[in-house]
Amino acid sequence: MHPFGADPEETAMTLMPPRSWLFVPADSEKKIAKALDSEADAIIFDLEDSVTAERKDAARAILKALPPRDGGPRWWVRINPVGSEHLKADLKMLASADMFGIVLPKAEGVGDVTHIAHRTGNVPIHAIVTETAASLFCLSSYRDAKAPLVAMSWGAEDLSAALGASSKYDANGELSFTYQWARSMTLAGAVAAGVQPVDGVFADYKDEVGLEAEARAAARDGFTGKLAIHPAQIAIINAAFTPSAAEIAHAEAIIAAFGADPSAGVLSINGRMVDRPHLLQAQGVLARARE
């Protein structure tokens, strides 16, 4: 494996933070083939929740037997969590599999990230940071990471089970306060740590309208990618996290205006007042734009 973004064969597009992170059970060659044929920016081969204990050895063997990646999406593997009896075998497998990075589930603070980094030679790590009750008290710790943390995402399903909740939704069908808080703190924690904030999964892969609404809301809030559980979700997610032509044009106008008057604190663009925070937002839009 190589440091995040250091592979000389990576294209300009794949060097950008992935918009779509697609989970696929690592023990299903059929589902892996479908995932590899998708337009996902990142594929997460799952050795954790979607693979039973009896199938984990077979799943590792399948990953080791995959041919070397030849372009396309980055390959990641979701290992079993720190403290799991399966972790040692997962990490051993990584030495002979062509994976870009690790997705660490049930992370409970920067210590878990550092632990994995010390055992893998600083492989890029995407931490899922809200899956246990204890994890909710650790979301500010990641800003101190010396390890190669590159992304943080949140998970509601495992958290709901950990808390003993009967549902993560309120009477109006919206996420209840606990899960809204976990989502918001993941976003803030990732930005504070200087890593990619990734929104959680939308479980009903057949509900395209609901997925689009949730993905676009996540993009508005500041997330730059989203986890996916089915190839059918990828096109909608990619579109939601790709700036539109109008957004790009507006961002370019803001940057050009401040470029023409570098000392200005406030300017007028198309009859609207913009200031330095708008300039930062515009720069972020262009950073996410794809040809």
Predicted regions, residues:
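Expand to "…catalyze enediolate/carbanion chemistry for C-C bond making/breaking, isomerization
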Residues: 2-291
